[in-house]
């Protein structure tokens, strides 16, 4: 019996040894903790802190922007971070845009890909929602951290409005600017300087000014947070983390209804200090219109 057991054991060990000798080497399984961001860029163009030959900042529109992950021009400023599943927007002072002295790596909504001419009004409504963080940002000479704009709603004149007030371009003020500022989120909107201004006068940028601004109570620091912007006729709402909300629905929003608008998102660094920089990470970003 002892001989039989030893023989059986020998056969088992021999078979196991043959299996190990002949088997293909095992490929280690690497668990992917994060997937790359699924952000649809089909209706966005991006402005980069890179000057063109005419001095204006470089812009990349659809469909070229869809290749950002392999585009040598875009890669330094807009790239995937597979360690946390984000789309990174990197900016530093280099090339400013019209009506601003600051640089940006910022998305601009295009309802018709490749064109700035199709936009929306408050009456038509819109929604933008994103989850993001600001993990890195520089400080000034006093040690205070710089700030950056992470979301906007920008106004735009129609061609008829532009011609009516004899402007050279279609630019109108941003009705909404959302800042990351010293670890907190600050919201600023525009208000009319004169509520009795005529329908023609309110088309001018000079007719509007910033309100005092409001901070959400939560301190986000460098951690992730979610922002949602909800627009309807005469009303603007900004929500953070589905727990706190600012609503603007007074006369200023009613008057704003004359403008066209478009959403913006990314990293609009609010300084021209040498060696300044910021990285903003978006984990998701969605826009929709009724």
Residue ranges and their predicted role:
Residues 6-14:
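Bacterial N-terminal signal peptides
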Residues 15-31:
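Bacterial Sec-dependent N-terminal signal peptides
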Residues 1-4:
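Positively charged n-region of N-terminal signal peptides that target proteins for export
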Residues 189-226:
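Short, aromatic/His-centered strand-loop micro-motif at the edge of beta-sheets
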Residues 128-130, 223-232, 236-238:
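Short tryptophan-centered beta-strand motifs in secreted/extracellular beta-sheet-rich domains
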Residues 69-73, 78-195:
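Secretory/extracellular carbohydrate-interaction modules
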Residues 33-41, 46, 50, 125-127, ...:
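Ligand-recognition surfaces built from glycine- and aromatic
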Residues 239-244:
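Short strand-turn-strand beta-turns centered on an Asx-Gly dipeptide
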């Amino acid at each position: 019996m002892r001989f039989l057991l030893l023989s059986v054991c020998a056969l088992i060990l021999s078979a196991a040894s043959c299996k190990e000798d002949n088997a293909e080497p095992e490929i280690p399984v690497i668990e992917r903790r994060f997937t790359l961001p699924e952000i649809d860029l089909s209706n966005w163009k991006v402005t980069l802190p890179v000057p063109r030959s005419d001095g204006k900042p470089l812009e990349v529109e659809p469909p070229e922007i869809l290749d950002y992950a392999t585009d040598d021009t875009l890669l330094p400023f807009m790239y995937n971070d597979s360690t946390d599943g984000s789309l990174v927007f990197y900016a530093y002072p280099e090339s400013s845009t019209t009506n601003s002295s600051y640089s940006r790596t910022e998305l601009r909504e295009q309802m018709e890909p490749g064109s700035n001419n199709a936009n929306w009004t408050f009456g038509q409504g819109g929604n933008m929602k994103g989850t993001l963080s600001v993990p890195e940002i520089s400080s000034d000479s006093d040690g205070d951290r710089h700030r950056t704009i992470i979301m906007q709603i920008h106004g735009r004149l129609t061609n008829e409005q532009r011609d009516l007030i004899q402007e050279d371009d279609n630019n109108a003020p941003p009705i909404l600017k959302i800042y990351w500022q010293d670890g907190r989120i600050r919201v600023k909107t525009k208000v009319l300087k004169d509520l009795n201004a005529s329908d023609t006068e309110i088309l001018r940028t000079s007719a509007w000014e910033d309100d005092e601004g409001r901070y959400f109570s939560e301190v986000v620091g460098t951690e992730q947070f979610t922002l949602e912007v909800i627009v309807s006729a005469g009303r603007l709402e900004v929500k953070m983390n589905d727990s706190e909300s600012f609503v603007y629905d007074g006369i200023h929003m009613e008057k704003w209804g004359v403008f066209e608008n478009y959403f913006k998102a990314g990293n609009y660094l609010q300084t021209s200090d040498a060696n300044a920089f910021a990285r903003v990470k978006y984990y998701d970003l969605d826009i929709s219109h009724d």
